[in-house]
Design a protein with these regions (language model features):
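Residue(s) in the substrate-gating loop at a strand-loop-helix junction
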Residues: 15
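A glycine/serine/threonine-rich, flexible loop-to-helix segment
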Residues: 62-96
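Alpha-helical segment proximal to the catalytic Tyr-Lys
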Residues: 44-48, 121
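Active-site helix of classical SDR
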Residues: 31, 39
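Conserved SDR Rossmann-fold cofactor-binding beta-strand/turn motif
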Residues: 52-62, 116, 129-131
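A conserved structural motif in NAD(P)-dependent oxidoreductases
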Residues: 85, 97-108
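Short C-terminal tail/terminal secondary-structure segment
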Residues: 20, 112-113, 124-138
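Active-site "substrate specificity/gating" loop of NAD(P)-dependent dehydrogenases
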Residues: 21-25, 47-48
């Protein structure tokens, strides 16, 4: 395994919901927070063995599941405010995210590849948000 080889990397996937909480799905947020913490514990345990452990936290990723959730939200808007889903969702995303666009699965994959590479050789125990600026720690 990784410890026997004295090198390797693990990348966990969590969510920004694990950092800021979710009013609509507290169990999801709690499980993602636990994921982040578990990865940090592993990072401390495995660093002396040359194994790096990091976490990627996606934000608003444009996936079929997220689109279904957002469409359901859109469909509950008051009558008379009818706008296309695309216009409505685009406005919401631009208001929520400083970079003003959905993340894509490729955005998340690119960070996982980076963290798995030698370019990230000095990174362990880190939680990296790929979220268009949604969560900013000052």
């Amino acid at each position: 395994g990784l410890v026997a080889r004295k090198r390797g990397t693990m990348v966990f996937l969590a969510s920004v919901a694990g950092q800021i909480g979710s009013q609509t799905d507290p169990p999801y947020s709690a499980s993602k927070a636990a994921n982040i913490n578990f990865a940090q514990c592993l990072a401390k345990d495995l660093a002396p063995h040359g194994v790096r452990v990091n976490t990627v936290c996606p934000g608003m990723v444009k996936t079929p599941l997220n689109e279904a959730v957002w469409r359901a939200w859109h469909d509950r808007q008051p009558a008379g405010t009818a706008r296309s889903y695309e216009d409505w969702a685009g406005e919401k995303i631009r208001a929520l995210l400083p970079l003003g666009r959905w993340q894509t699965p490729a955005d998340i994959a690119n960070m996982v590849v980076f963290l798995s590479s030698e370019r990230a050789a000095q990174m362990t125990g880190q939680t990296v948000n790929v979220d268009g600026g949604f969560v900013m720690h000052w």
